[in-house]
C-alpha cells in the first residue's frame, strides 16, 4: 500500500524534471529583432538611428558588433550616445571556438560597466550562436536547450549555416571553456582579436 501511495509523487517529480522550462529571450522591440537575454545582455539586428534612445533607456553601456563587412553602422546609429562601441568581426562560415571565447570574454569584461548589446546584421545567426554559448557557459543551460533556442526561437535563424550547429559538440565547448580560462588569466592585457571600444559623444 505504501508503494502505491508514493507512486503519484514519483510520477509528479518525473514530469517536473521533463518539463524544466528554460525561458527564451524576452522581446523588447520586434522590428529591431531586439530581445533581452538577461539583466546584462541584449541581442538585436544592426541598430539604426531610431533605436538609439531605446538602447540608452535600457541601460546598455556597450554595443558589440559581430559584422565582418560594413562595420560603421553603430557609429552612424549611436553617435553622441556615450555608449562604448566594439567591433568583433566574425565570418559566419568560419567561426572557431577561439572566436566564440574571445567574444564571450569581451561581453564578460564589458558587463562590469553595465548591460551589453550584441548584434550582427540580422541578429539571428552569429548573434544567436553567441547567445547560445552564453547560455551554456554563464547560465549553465543544457547544450540541447541553448541550441534549440538558437534554431527554433523567433530570431530568424537561417538553417543554411549548418557549420554553426556543429560548434555545439562537447569537444568545441570544452575548447571554448579552456580558452576563456586562458583569457581570464591574462585579463589585464587587451590583445588581438579584440579591438578597443570607442566612446562616441
List each model region and its residues.
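Bacterial N-terminal signal peptides
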Residues: 4-13
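Cys-dependent protein tyrosine phosphatase-like superfamily
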Residues: 16-116, 129-201
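Short cysteine clusters
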Residues: 120
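Conserved lysine of the Walker
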Residues: 126
Amino acid at each position: 500500500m505504501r508503494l502505491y501511495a508514493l507512486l503519484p509523487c514519483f510520477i509528479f517529480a518525473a514530469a517536473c524534471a521533463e518539463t524544466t522550462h528554460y525561458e527564451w529571450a524576452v522581446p523588447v522591440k520586434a522590428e529591431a529583432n531586439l530581445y533581452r537575454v538577461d539583466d546584462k545582455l541584449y541581442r538585436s539586428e544592426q541598430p539604426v538611428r531610431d533605436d538609439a534612445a531605446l538602447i540608452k533607456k535600457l541601460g546598455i553601456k556597450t554595443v558589440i558588433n559581430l559584422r565582418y563587412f560594413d562595420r560603421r553602422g553603430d557609429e552612424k546609429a549611436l553617435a553622441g550616445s556615450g555608449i562604448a562601441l566594439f567591433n568583433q568581426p566574425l565570418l559566419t562560415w568560419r567561426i572557431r571556438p577561439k572566436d566564440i571565447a574571445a567574444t564571450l570574454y569581451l561581453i564578460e569584461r564589458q558587463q562590469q560597466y553595465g548591460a551589453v548589446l550584441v548584434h550582427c546584421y540580422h541578429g539571428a545567426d552569429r548573434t544567436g550562436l553567441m547567445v547560445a554559448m552564453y547560455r551554456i557557459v554563464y547560465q549553465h543551460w543544457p547544450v540541447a536547450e541553448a541550441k534549440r533556442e538558437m534554431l527554433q526561437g523567433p530570431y530568424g535563424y537561417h538553417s543554411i549555416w549548418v557549420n554553426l550547429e556543429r560548434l555545439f559538440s562537447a569537444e568545441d565547448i570544452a575548447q571554448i571553456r579552456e580558452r576563456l580560462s586562458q583569457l581570464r588569466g591574462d585579463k589585464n592585457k587587451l590583445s588581438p582579436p579584440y579591438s578597443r571600444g570607442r566612446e562616441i559623444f
